[in-house]
Structures are given as C-alpha cells and as structure tokens.
Amino acid sequence: MGKIRKLDDQLSNLIAAGEVVERPASVVKELVENSIDANSTSIEIHLEEAGLSKIRIIDNGDGIAEEDCIVAFERHATSKIKDENDLFRIRTLGFRGEALPSIASVSELELITSTGDAPGTHLIIKGGDIIKQEKTASRKGTDITVQNLFFNTPARLKYMKTIHTELGNITDIVYRIAMSHPEVSLKLFHNEKKLLHTSGNGDVRQVLASIYSIQVAKKLVPIEAESLDFTIKGYVTLPEVTRASRNYMSTIVNGRYVRNFVLMKAIQQGYHTLLPVGRYPIGFLSIEMDPMLVDVNVHPAKLEVRFSKEQELLKLIEETLQAAFKKIQLIPDAGVTTKKKEKDESVQEQFQFEHAKPKEPSMPEIVLPTGMDEKQEEPLAVKQPTQLWQPPKQEWQPPQSLVREEQSWQPSTKPIIEEPIQEEKSWDSNEEGFELEELEEEVREIKEIEMNGNDLPPLYPIGQMHGTYIFAQNDKGLYMIDQHAAQERINYEYFRDKVGRVAQEVQELLVPYRIDLSLTEFLRVEEQLEELKKVGLFLEQFGHQSFIVRSHPTWFPKGQETEIIDEMMEQVVKLKKVDIKKLREEAAIMMSCKASIKANQYLTNDQIFALLEELRTTTNPYTCPHGRPILVHHSTYELEKMFKRVM
C-alpha cells in the first residue's frame, strides 16, 4: 500500500492557516481588505483583548449573496480572478481565496451579510465546520466576527505576544490601510475605546495627522511626479523630523501596502546628506502603475512584490524628492522643542558623482585678514585649506562636550527597535476630547510649505560663541551656525567633485607608505586596483600580502595623507564588492570632516564673513554631509515672545 495520501480539506486549511493567519493582525488585514474589495466606504473594527478574544469587522460594502456564502469558505474560491491572465492584471487586494477558510479553520466565526436586494445570510462556523446557516434580516454589507482565535491550535496560541504587542501589530496594519485608502472611513476600537477615526474624505494628509499628530502634518512636503509607466504621489517630512526606524515609511503600490526595502532606500537616497546616519523620515508614497509591471503573487500575506522596471521607478522617486527639497529653505525652527518628541519616540519604537565636467573648482578656504602670519606652503596645483588662526587661550574653557569634531562624526548608539507604529497623539481618544471635525479644521488651516527656492538668505554675522557657533541676523530673525558643519559642507562639495574627477596632479611621498593586510584582505584589494585608481588610491604590490603607496592626489588634506589612505583602505576591505560611487561618497565625506574647522577655534570677523559667503554658494547649505543641521533659526516673533514683548 502506498504511503502518499491526499490530505482532507480541514487539515489542508489548518496548514494554510499557518501561512496566512500568523496572528490577530493577519485576520484584521485580510478581513478589512475584503471589505475594501467589496467597495465599502465605511469600515468599523472592534477588538477585544487585542483580537485574541474577539475581532469584529462591520462594513457597508456589496455583501455576499446567499449562494456564495458557503463557497466563500472553501479553499481557493474567489470572485476576483477567473483565469491565469487575470493573475497578471490584479487590481484587488485579495485574489487567492485562502483567507476566509484559513481564518474559519482556527476560530469560531460568525457571518451576517446581505447584498441589499434579498434577505441576509447568517452563518456560524467553528474550526472549519459549519454549525448553522439561516436567512436573517440584515442591512446591506457584511458583519463578520472572529472569536477565540487559535482555540484548536494551542501551540500557535502559546507563541502569541503580550496584548500590548499584538494590539501594536494590529494598529500598524490599520494605519497602513488608512493611508492606502483615505477615501474609506475607518474606525478602530479596542475594548470599546476608540483608537482611530478617519473621515474617508480622500485627504491623506488628514489621515497622517490622525496617526502621527498635527505637528508632523505641518512638516509634510508634498511629492508628485509622473512618467510613462509610473505615477507617484505622497508626503514626506522635512529633514528636521526623523525617527530611529524605517518603520515610519509606508509604500503603497496600486492601493496595496507593501514592504519593499529598495523603495525605502530610494526615499532615503532622495534625502541624500539631509538626514543624520541612523535616522529616517516619516513618509507616505503611493505608486500607481500597470498591474503587468508588478507581481503581487510572491508572498502569502501579499506584502512583498516584484517590479519589472525597478530601476526606472527608483530613479523617479530619488529625483522627485531631490527636486522637491531644492525648492525649500531647509532651516529648522529653533522654537520647536524636541525633548518630548524623543520621549514619545522611544515608546513608538516598539512599534553618483559622475558630473559633467564643470570648470575646475578652487579649494574652499577662509580668507585670512591682512597682516596675519601665514605659513608658507610648497606650491601645489590646488591650494589646501588654510589653517585658521586661533587666539591665545582665554580663562574660560569650553565644556568637554563642545570639543567633539576631532573625530569623524558618529551617529547615536541608541539601539533601534523595529516595532509597529504607535500613535503620537490620538485625536479621537476620550481623554483628549478632540473630535474629527476639529482635526479636519486643523488640517485645512495648515499652510503649505513654501517652495520658492532653497538659496540661503543673506546673513550678517554678529558674533561667535565658545569658538564653535556663529551668530548672524537678518530681517527674519537670529541664526545660529555650527562653524564646523558649515565648512564641512563647503569642503564636501569640493572633494566630491575632485574625487569624481581624478586628475594627473599627484604628489610624491618622501617615504613610500606601506600597507600590510591579511591574505583575504590582500586578495580582495588586488581585484580592485584599477577601480581604486579612480578615487585617487594608487597601490603597488609589495611582497605577498602588502602594498605600497608612492604618490597621492594633490588635493588630499595636507598632513593627513596617510590617515586618508588608511581609512579609504578600510572602506575597501569592508565591502565585498567595491561600489565606486559609494566609495567616492565616503572618501569625500571623510576628507571634508578632517579638513574643516574644529570646535573651540576662534575666527575673526573677516573669516566668519568669508565662511558664510562660501556657504551660500553650495548646493545644499542646510546640512553637513552627515545630515546634521548647519544652522537653526529663531524668528523675531519667537524672541519677542521669549522676552514677553508679545503674549
């Protein structure tokens, strides 16, 4: 007798449930998506004990006809596709016909539904077995209740997390759906307490305000672009509003929320040097395309997709974001306090430099006043950064925290915890007392971010503090400038161009510099010798596991040549495959930091003025290459308010 047998339907559904129904959030996702596919304009979600005890979804959609009710709970039964061609033209959120039978097989399920033109149907299913079916009076739409989830699979139940965690997973899913479909009114309740209410008026910014707070909504930059194959719309926050997790970026493809790392990476690339390392924006991006260009039949939960023209899409996203930021003055408002935000965030976190050849740039430098001693340098094709004069030490000594730029800037080591989004501020919570109408009014009153160019306004220096910060003013108020970050940006744009166009101008080292490597590192570097010449690293093999450097580009920061070579080699060794574009970027950032003014370095008025004028000529005068702000702004009104001149 053969050993292979066909499994019965109930066991097959239990196995399928293991893929489709991982936790209560999976149930909520599948049922709410079914409601949206049924043309619902209003959906209510009621939870008890984070859905482990009870999940109830009520919608005003098309409903299910009586003759379809039983069929709907059979495996691979669906109204959304008919043949294999439909699989490549999917516009609905569901299409496999697996969700309902999988959910019913591991729960006690009750369904009341009506199409509106006939009596409704009442259906009770327990563990996949139909217990009751009868006609009933019902309004148009569907009311489905799932109780005692995983009652017959105790092993699965044992691996559920705390109620708080499971509720977080559900709110995360509901928030993404709300952003994906702002035309649908969504209400989310937990133990009879309202957690979310969206109006369904189609305004995604209002949904974002409901989820992230009105303060975040005020910092949103609209994004919109179109190509032959793609249309993208959405909002991203100004660079000053960041989080420690990518989880606050939502990508929507043809109305479906998807998790796609390359799309998130494209959003990050759109910010290029505007964000600190390890920080991420809040963003929502909706992408419309021909269904033939995207494969959604990849993941059981339909969260992962594959694109046919991925590189074209990524380029469109990057260029659209970069173009948007070039129209905005990205000076953060110093009047905004961030202490509370950081505290809130710790809770929520559960939850190519190939330019066309321009004219040869001159090395940015700070002009020394006449009469100052200046060290004579050997004549070079490109002049190195001038050493800034520093006065004798004063009695006052700066706090140790100010002397911080001697090393390359490093991001905070605060651990990043990837968890679902949690609300920053619930506009519909009972204790807050906010109503949906009030939120709508708040959103309507938000002023659009001005997009009339990102040129730095003229600044008139008035002093320096602690040898680190420059104070300047204009008719709009007071500006505080980090002098190290400012010159770092100037130097970065200079070195970025130089590293991208390695010239024949090299300088011989008096003593060749030897680099010893392990065998693995040596072999990895040996493969990339020709590529490394493109970034100014000229290596000659010396022995079995060593290289020597006899010369370097003239634009290497003077006195730091060997240090630059060492750090560039470290970058090469760390990368399994050398990405020249990335290596050029890292090299430019590293050299710009080392060649810039340090903290506790006093400048004359002429030097300060020259620094600010040089900063104004950069393409991005608002952040250093590491993404830290260069300057912050106190408006005249804020200052008057601080001194009680206005109330």
UniProtKB/Swiss-Prot annotation:
Protein name: DNA mismatch repair protein MutL
Task performed by this protein: This protein is involved in the repair of mismatches in DNA. It is required for dam-dependent methyl-directed DNA mismatch repair. May act as a 'molecular matchmaker', a protein that promotes the formation of a stable complex between two or more DNA-binding proteins in an ATP-dependent manner without itself being part of a final effector complex.
InterPro entries, alphabetized: DNA_mismatch_repair_CS, DNA_mismatch_repair_MutL, DNA_mismatch_S5_2-like, HATPase_C_sf, MutL/Mlh/PMS, MutL/Mlh/Pms-like, MutL_C, MutL_C_dimsub
GO BP of this protein: mismatch repair
Family per similarity comment: Belongs to the DNA mismatch repair MutL/HexB family.
Keywords for this protein: DNA damage, DNA repair
PROSITE patterns in the cross-refs: DNA_MISMATCH_REPAIR_1
UniProt-listed Pfam families: DNA_mis_repair, HATPase_c_3, MutL_C
Gene: mutL
Molecular function terms, GO-annotated: ATP binding; ATP hydrolysis activity; ATP-dependent DNA damage sensor activity; mismatched DNA binding
UniProt entry tagged with the keyword DNA damage: yes
GO cellular component: mismatch repair complex
Record PANTHER family: DNA MISMATCH REPAIR PROTEIN MLH, PMS, MUTL, DNA MISMATCH REPAIR PROTEIN MLH1
